[in-house]
């Protein structure tokens, strides 16, 4: 029972770090990156579909993204979705492909994006801490019900604390990396 609780908590913490990695990856840095379009969804015959399933996304130059829809009929919808997203870019299409020029980030915008990255990192750390809290509650229930001895539960709590520290450190590292990426001119 203790092992299941620890395994479950580890799995959820891993998922929280993965979500943080994806969220931080979607923050624009001033360089072209296909990952910045991951959160954009397009209405495709009545269902919201990720842009990555409707078009190929390539980066031929450091500041240019080329998006080629698999269906020409989706060109306008993809262009509108990119324009209406929070990326701050202006796509242009030539009838076959969409070109997205990535503008230089201003100092003010960089600072804004750093704040956004820190906020997403903090949200992920809160998520990890909530997972830890729930696992600790489960461990104390196990101890109270007599399903395991005090020593076993104490050892499990230490392991849980170690895992929590490891995953929050990973999140801090991701945020630090993103921050340096954003502030790099």
Swiss-Prot record:
Any Pfam family the entry gives: RRF
Main location: cytoplasm
Region (Disordered): 142-164
Cellular component GO terms held in the UniProt record: cytoplasm
Keyword Transport on entry: no
Keyword Protein biosynthesis part of the UniProt annotation: yes
SUPFAM superfamilies xref list: Ribosome recycling factor, RRF
InterPro entries recorded: Ribosome_recyc_fac, Ribosome_recyc_fac_dom, RRF_sf
Biological process terms in GO annotation: translational termination
MF annotations from Gene Ontology: ribosomal large subunit binding
Entry keyword set: Cytoplasm, Protein biosynthesis
Subcellular location: Cytoplasm
HAMAP family: RRF
Function: Responsible for the release of ribosomes from messenger RNA at the termination of protein biosynthesis. May increase the efficiency of translation by recycling ribosomes from one round of translation to another.
Similarity annotation: Belongs to the RRF family.
Protein name: Ribosome-recycling factor
Organism in which the protein naturally occurs: Mycolicibacterium smegmatis (strain ATCC 700084 / mc(2)155)
Gene this chain is encoded by: frr
